[in-house]
Structures are given as C-alpha cells and as structure tokens.
Amino acid sequence: MKKSAPVPIGIVGASGYGGVQLVKLLQNHPKVEVVYLGGDSSAGKPFSSIYPHLEHSVDLKIESIELDKIANKSQIVFLSLPNGLAWKMAPNLLEKGCKVLDLSADYRFSNLETYQSWYGGERTDQKIAATAVYGLPELYRDRIANAQLIGCPGCYVTASLLALSPLFKQGLIVPETAIIDAKSGTSGGGRKANINMLLAEADNSVGPYGVASHRHTPEIEQICSNLAGYDVKVQFTPHLMPMVRGILATVYGTLRDPGLVREDLLTIYNAFYRNCPWVKVLPSGTYPQTKWASGTNLCYLGIEVDHRTDRVIIMSAIDNLIKGQAGQSIQCMNLMMGWEETLGLPQLSFYP
C-alpha cells in the first residue's frame, strides 16, 4: 500500500517556547512535515542558531511572515504569537484554504467584547471569530473535528477546566464557591527578557501575581458558565514557582450534597473522562505532581472531599508547554484531520 504524502505544516512564531515545542513534537509526528517556520526579528536565521540542540533534526530557516507564501506552502498553520496578532492573519489564511490553530487568546472568546475588555485593542473580524471552536478536546471533541479555526486554551485554563468541568456540568457545587489556587513554572512567561524570571529573582521564591485580575479568569468563567447553564464567577490566583515547567491547579468548591464521598466523585470523574486518553483520574488517596506530567500531553487529576468543610478538592497537574499549549494544539489538529487523538504526542515523562 502506497504511503500518503505528509501534510505540510507552517508555524508562525516558531522561535518562542511554544513554537519550539511545536517544532519538536511535529518532527516526531508520522503524518506531517514542517515546511515553514516564520518570525519577524529572527527572519533569515537558521532555526538551529536559536535552538542549537535541534541542529541535527531541523534543517529550516526562519522566514519572514508573508501570508501568501505561508498559505501556498502549508495545509495547516499554527499561530504561536503574542495576543493581538493572530486575528490579523487568520482570516487571510482561512480564505486561502488553510486550517488554522491559534495558540494566543485571540479566538478563545465567544464574545469579542470580553476579549477587548481584558486584552484591549480593536477587532474587525467578528464574522471569522464567530466560527472559531474552543480547543479543549475533552469538552468539544466533535466540534473541533469539523472546525477550520481553533482557539487553543490557555495553560492555566486547561488545568483549571479539566478539574472543574465535571463539577459544573453535573451541578455538584454551590454557585460562586469555586476557588482556583494555581502554580506555574517560569516557562509560562515566555522567552522574552523579564526581571521576574531571572534566576536570582525566581529561585528560592514563590509569589502570586495577577491577583483578582489575571486574564485567564474570564476564559475559565466563560466555559464554566457554558457547562453550568448560568453565569459563573470563580476566584483565580496564579503563583510563580521556582521551576521551569509544569502547572498544579488546586480547585475548591462547596458541595451541594454534603453526603457525597470521595469514591462518589471518583466514579463521576472516571465516567466523565472515560473516552479521554489524555486525562488520568488518580486512585483514591493519590495526588498529582507536576513531574509526572512533565514532557507529556497528560493531565493528572487527584480528588478529595473534606467533610469538615463540605468542600471538594480537585488537584490538576499538566505540563504548561505541552498539554497547556503545543501538545493540546496538536491534539486538536489530529481531531481536525480525522487521526487518532494520541498520534505523535508523548505519554511518558522524564523521571526523576
């Protein structure tokens, strides 16, 4: 049987941490070939001059961002760019027949007014934005499979929603009691220079940021509201940890039925995620660690009930650059192309 030609892939914004994760993962994908890497400040440079450890496997130069050229070369385009840039490119690429996966916040919101109030800027792509599908496969697998434009979730959002979704979908917690305490490694801040990410600043220190104002908050609330059927507000506080990668989100909510026990919640979560190969619900009394998910597309969920306070506690661990970014976008691509959801994605972490 003749082997089919690989699907050509373009990556715009290849020089950042999200971009290099995409390149690395797609190099090992059996059905695609990366044919275009795009960037502005790095245009003309060999990709290996930015990431020398990939010199033996990636023989491409960073090219200037020219949409016609990208569309002519690529069937699928990943946009790994800062917020506010993808929406200026996606309509043109879609018009030329490309499938587009956006890793920024530009296409995550069903209401562009919400996007503008948190991210700023004007938008003139309302019609295109209305066609975007939210790229969390565990919730929207069928819609993703039929989409041309995907708005991939944020990293904190992915960890938080995978913990919260069964609670809101099943109406298990009292409205307005959801609290998310999340911790992330420094790679979540990207590759640009940032004083807070310097070793001397971040090492041996843990601190909150974006308190009561983090831009992932409305994204979490949007999906939780859709699941619950009413407007949901959550309390979300992220923290920076002295580690490179990983997110641990610990979610709290007051149970509507204080008679529920841990085994009840385990049954509910296992049923909710029974067809989700990338979500692992841990056995009773086992709680996740970020190291378990590092380098994989997995999400580990631990479950506990505190009968003293009538609260459920869900702990969610992911790799912020894989399940929280590049890996999840490839998971969406697999669904869009009718391939196995697990194709080309890592399942085993480096341990210890």
Swiss-Prot record:
Pathway(s) where this gene product acts: Amino-acid biosynthesis; L-arginine biosynthesis; N(2)-acetyl-L-ornithine from L-glutamate: step 3/4
SMART domains: Semialdhyde_dh
CDD domains, per the entry: AGPR_1_C, AGPR_1_N
EC assignment: 1.2.1.38
InterPro entries for this protein: AGPR_AS (IPR023013), AGPR_type-1 (IPR000706), NAD(P)-bd_dom_sf (IPR036291), NAGSA_dehydrogenase (IPR050085), Semialdehyde_DH_NAD-bd (IPR000534)
Superkingdom of origin: Bacteria
Pfam families per the UniProt record, alphabetical: Semialdhyde_dh, Semialdhyde_dhC_1
Stated name of the protein: N-acetyl-gamma-glutamyl-phosphate reductase
